[in-house]
Regions:
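N-terminal intrinsically disordered, cationic/polar leader segments
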Residues: 1-117, 121-131
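Flexible glycine-rich active-site/ligand-binding loops centered on an Asp-His dyad
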Residues: 135-139
Length: 139
């Protein structure tokens, strides 16, 4: 396991005017390569309102799987032009979350350094809403 620094920026577009909610997390993580993907493990913080949670990113060339464990738990899979539905568990109950990945841009080198960019829309009752962006920088 290698120690690494990870910067994760999440942006949610709030309205038609393009107003956005932006959260940045800079954290220490562990990084390993398991043959077909890089695995990044890190602890969430109060910045992400998920303190005490652990997150694992499994980063493949064509998709990313995000697994959150703790008081909030979910498994989200991002693959370009694919829809996905996952269970999202909170202390207040569980619900299904559906989303469509619009862009998946993998720019990691053979050491697992670089960036991954994802754009996805959360789908509520069959209607696409809430454009979200995730930028992951690993070095």
């Amino acid at each position: 396991l290698n120690k690494t620094k990870v910067k994760i920026t999440t942006i949610q577009i709030l309205d038609e005017a393009g107003n956005e909610d932006k959260i940045e997390l800079l954290t220490e993580a562990t990084k390993e390569f398991n043959g077909d993907c890089f695995i990044i493990d890190y602890d969430e913080s109060e910045i992400t309102q998920s303190e005490g949670n652990k997150t694992r990113l499994k980063i493949y060339k064509d998709k990313l799987i995000m697994i959150k464990m703790g008081t909030l738990s979910t498994k989200m899979e991002f693959e370009e032009n694919k829809n996905s539905t996952n269970m999202y568990t909170t202390p207040y109950g569980s619900f299904d979350i559906s989303f469509k990945t619009i862009i998946y841009d993998y720019s990691l080198n053979e050491l697992g350094n670089g960036s991954v960019y994802i754009e996805y829309k959360i789908i509520f009752d069959g209607a696409e809403e809430a454009l979200n962006k995730i930028m992951i920088d690993i070095n």
